[in-house]
Amino acid sequence: MNKIEALIEQYCPEGIEFKDLREVAKISNGKDHKYLEAGNYPVYGSGGIMRYVNQFIYNVESVLIPRKGSIGNIFYVSEPFWTVDTIFYTKIDRRSITPKFLYYYLKTLDLTELNFAGGVPSLTKTILDRISIPIPPLPVQEEIVNILDKFTTLEAELEAELEARKTQYEFYRNQLLNFEGKDVEWKTLGEIGVFIRGNGLQKKDFTSSGVGCIHYGQVYTLYGIYAYSTKTFVSNDFAKKLKKAKKGDLIIAATSENVEDVCKAVAWLGDNQIAISGDAFIFRHNQNPKFIAYYFKTNSFFENKKRFATGTK
């Protein structure tokens, strides 16, 4: 029996009580902030902190729940704050529930399922008031919060470490693949290979099985430097109409909404040929496919690419 189970057995052997949110917290509206002067108190909207002002709307621990817009963005605040009219704040009955326990529980819910609007996602007090909240005894709540806080800290540390490693990787990749001023032979892509434009494939053509395929949009959303298998397929009959990439080819996105993703490339290392969509190129060459794909990610290639990019999607 773990500590949480032991506490539940000790304090609520008959089970955990549930209450509507309105029974443990009063939901309050935010207000306009435009007339306020600059200061030290954060102003929250549904997207997060917007600015800092010289007044606060509430100065007690609270959970902020968006009313409109990014309704999944729930915030826990422990310092004085101001909220605008797109986000609710809560006055919590601490005799029944700890604010952070309420925050963690609400984060487990998909509030978008409670959206009542057809346009901009929206929530109302009436809808939120009816949310059922588990109310274990306060010692149980505090232990749960303590455990989740530790995992939150660990997650933040791991994210920071991952970001540091990513920066380190990008630095060494650019250094290792920087041949400017060095005694190496330079050739254009056209001198080492040929470009074959894809054709005809749209997302609506995907099937659950068949011939593997890569749509140009997937090159910068689903794939890394190289791939041995595809995420999607087309029927055998439809595949006969499409251009195919074979092992060692690069698949290059020819268009994007930003210059960073234009010419994003994935090296195809699978044994079977795969179908390619329009707005993508197959680059067929006699070089190391991973080397070429890695080079496509360097700062040097990016700067050259910017010179030739004629527009975005």
Predicted regions and their residues:
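A short beta-sheet element
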Residues: 45-107, 116-119, 124, 215, ...
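Short, structured motif recognition centered on aromatic/hydrophobic residues
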Residues: 16, 41, 103, 148-151, ...
